[in-house]
UniProtKB/Swiss-Prot annotation:
The lineage of its organism: Eukaryota, Metazoa, Chordata, Craniata, Vertebrata. Residues 1-138 are annotated as: Disordered. The modification Phosphothreonine is found at T26. Residues 120-131 have a biased composition (Polar residues). The record marks W126 as: Binding to nucleic acids. Residues 1-11 have a biased composition (Basic and acidic residues). It comes from Sus scrofa. The gene is TNP4. This is Spermatid nuclear transition protein 4. Residues 86-101 have a biased composition (Low complexity). One of its GO terms (cellular component) is nucleus. The N-terminal half is highly basic. A motif (Nuclear localization signal) lies at residues 5-23, 54-72. Keywords: Chromosome, Developmental protein, Differentiation, DNA-binding, Nucleosome core, Nucleus, Phosphoprotein, Spermatogenesis. The modification Phosphoserine is found at S4. The keyword Transferase does not apply.
Length: 138
């Protein structure tokens, strides 16, 4: 069986503090209703330091800046330049052709003339016809 004890009463009398009237806090900034931010009333002016200004003037006078080029639409053209690998293969083809011609001359056979024509690597309709986009033949 549980026995509940009475809480001990303090021997000294406790004086109850009188209630103070709570005052509403005074806000430093007026709050706007509706969650909209109020525009700032003060503006800060940024000032450059004097020595920095002098440096900037000296550097800008010595080296004028280049004008930036405006961006243009990206258009891809078929590149007619040969890469280093293509040049090597062409040299090998020519060497082989020269060897054949020399062998045929030694045998006394007529030399068949062949033109070396590179096939375009892309499936572009202009490239397969041997015409660039600007209408020039190569």
């Amino acid at each position: 069986a549980k026995v509940s004890r009475k809480p001990r009463e303090p021997r000294t009398a406790v004086t109850q503090s009188t209630r103070r009237i709570k005052r509403k806090k005074t806000l430093s900034k007026p709050r706007s209703r509706g969650g909209v931010k109020a525009p700032k009333t003060t503006m800060k002016i940024k000032r450059a330091l004097r020595r920095n200004l002098r440096r900037k003037i000296q550097t800008s006078a010595g080296q004028p800046k280049k004008a930036k080029k405006a961006r243009k639409h990206f258009v891809s053209y078929y590149v007619l330049k040969k890469s280093g690998q293509n040049k090597k293969t062409n040299q090998n083809k020519r060497q082989n052709q020269n060897k054949r011609q020399n062998q045929n001359k030694r045998r006394g056979q007529p030399v068949p003339e062949q033109e070396i024509m590179e096939k375009p690597t892309t499936s572009c309709k202009w490239c397969s016809q041997g015409v660039t986009r600007r209408g020039r033949r190569y």
